[in-house]
C-alpha cells in the first residue's frame, strides 16, 4: 500500500508525502506528473498492474508512451525498436516481440516491466518486491538496473524483505510495521 500511496493510486488517511518539498498526498498520478515529477512504478503484481498479460512486448511498451503522440494514429515502430533493444540489453528470452508476456518466465516479465519503466527516465522509481520469485541471475540483473538508476540520480523507493539486499542496495532503510491493538 505504501507504493500505491506514493504513486497516487491510493489515498493516505493522514500525513504527508513530500517529494522535493512538494506534498503529493491526495494527488492522482496525472496531477503528480503535472507537478513536474516524472515517476515510474513497478508493482508487486507484474501482470495484473504492470503489464497486460495477453499483449506482446511492443504493445506493452506503448502503454507508457501512446499519449505522447501528436496524431490519433499510433506509430508502433519506436515501441518495437524499444522492445528489441530491451531484449538485447537485458537479455530477455522471448520467441518475439509479439509473444504475449504471459508466456515469458517471471524474470523475463520483470525485465520487460523494469526496462519499460526505466526507459521513461523517471526522477522517482517506485518498486515493490521487484525480485520476488525470480531466479538468482534475474535478481542480480534487476539489482544492477536499480543501482544504475541510483547512480544516475534517480530516487529509488525499494520495498523488499531480504535484509542483505536492502543493506547492499539502499542508502536509507525504513522499517514499517502494521500494528493493531488486540480487542479486549
Task: Place the predicted regions along the sequence by residue.
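A short, surface-exposed alpha-helical micro-motif characterized by mixed small hydrophobic
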Residues: 166-168
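Short, glycine/charged-rich "phosphate-handling" switch motifs in NTP-dependent
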Residues: 172
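Conserved ABC transporter NBD signature motif
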Residues: 15-24, 33-37
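ABC-family nucleotide-binding domains
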Residues: 128, 135
Amino acid at each position: 500500500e505504501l507504493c500505491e500511496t506514493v504513486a497516487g493510486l491510493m489515498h493516505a488517511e493522514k500525513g504527508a508525502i513530500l517529494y522535493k518539498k512538494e506534498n503529493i498526498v491526495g494527488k492522482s498520478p496525472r496531477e503528480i506528473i503535472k507537478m513536474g515529477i516524472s515517476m515510474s512504478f513497478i508493482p508487486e503484481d507484474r501482470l495484473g498492474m504492470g503489464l497486460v498479460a495477453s499483449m506482446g512486448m511492443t504493445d506493452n511498451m506503448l502503454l507508457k508512451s501512446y499519449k505522447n503522440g501528436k496524431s490519433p494514429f499510433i506509430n508502433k515502430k519506436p515501441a518495437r525498436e524499444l522492445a528489441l533493444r530491451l531484449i538485447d540489453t537485458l537479455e530477455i528470452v522471448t520467441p518475439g516481440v509479439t509473444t504475449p508476456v504471459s508466456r515469458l518466465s517471471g524474470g523475463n516479465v520483470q525485465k520487460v516491466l523494469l526496462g519499460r519503466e526505466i526507459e521513461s527516465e523517471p526522477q522517482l522509481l517506485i518498486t515493490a518486491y521487484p525480485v520476488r520469485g525470480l531466479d538468482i541471475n534475474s535478481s542480480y540483473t534487476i539489482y544492477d538496473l536499480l543501482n544504475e538508476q541510483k547512480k544516475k540520480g534517480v530516487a529509488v523507493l525499494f520495498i523488499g524483505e531480504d535484509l542483505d539486499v536492502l543493506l547492499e542496495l539502499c542508502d536509507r532503510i525504513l522499517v514499517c510495521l502494521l500494528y493493531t491493538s488486540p480487542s479486549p
